[in-house]
Curated annotation (Swiss-Prot):
Gene3D superfamilies: Ribosomal protein S20. This is Small ribosomal subunit protein bS20. Binds directly to 16S ribosomal RNA. Belongs to the bacterial ribosomal protein bS20 family. It comes from the Bacteria. The keyword RNA-binding applies. It comes from Oceanobacillus iheyensis (strain DSM 14371 / CIP 107618 / JCM 11309 / KCTC 3954 / HTE831). It holds the Pfam family Ribosomal_S20p.
Amino acid sequence: MANIKSAIKRVEVNEKKRVSNSKQLSAMRTEVKRVEKAVEANDTDNAKSLFQSASKHIDKAAQKGIIHQNAANRQKSRLANKINAL
């Protein structure tokens, strides 16, 4: 464990950020899985509405630096292509 006050604070702040980032990343992945499940079931209307929610979560994660912007764009593009293929 760190002895210096600033190092102790960094440990605490990093832990809080890690937990927050983990929650947001998990929520994003869950939304993506819901879209993919709807696509597998050939449920176009549901997939489109779920895609909007997933897109929002992906953009939020990219905006907060949890994932890279290019990775976010790639994920949204691949989901959109799957939906358009229905």
